[in-house]
């Protein structure tokens, strides 16, 4: 499983499973199976 923190939505094959936080910015945690 590969995960990324993305600011603007997930790629088509990725799933949003949580959130990442850097300072005041919240990113989506997107994982690919």
UniProtKB/Swiss-Prot annotation:
UniProt keyword list: Antibiotic, Antimicrobial, Defensin, Disulfide bond, Fungicide, Secreted
- On the tree of life, the source organism's domain of life is Eukaryota
- PROSITE patterns according to UniProt: DEFENSIN
Q: Where in the cell is it found?
A: Secreted
Which processes are annotated in GO (biological process)? defense response to bacterium; defense response to fungus; killing of cells of another organism
Among the entry's GO cellular component annotations, what is one?
A: extracellular region
Signal sequence, renumbered to the chain: none
- Which cystines does this chain contain? 3-31, 5-20, 10-30
**InterPro entries linked:** Alpha-defensin_C, Beta/alpha-defensin_C
Q: Which family does it belong to?
A: Belongs to the alpha-defensin family.
Function, as annotated: Anti-fungal and bactericidal activity, greater against Gram-positive bacteria.
Full protein name: Neutrophil defensin 3
């Amino acid at each position: 499983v590969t995960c990324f923190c993305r600011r603007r939505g997930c790629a088509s094959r990725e799933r949003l499973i949580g959130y990442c936080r850097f300072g005041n910015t919240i990113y989506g945690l997107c994982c690919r199976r």
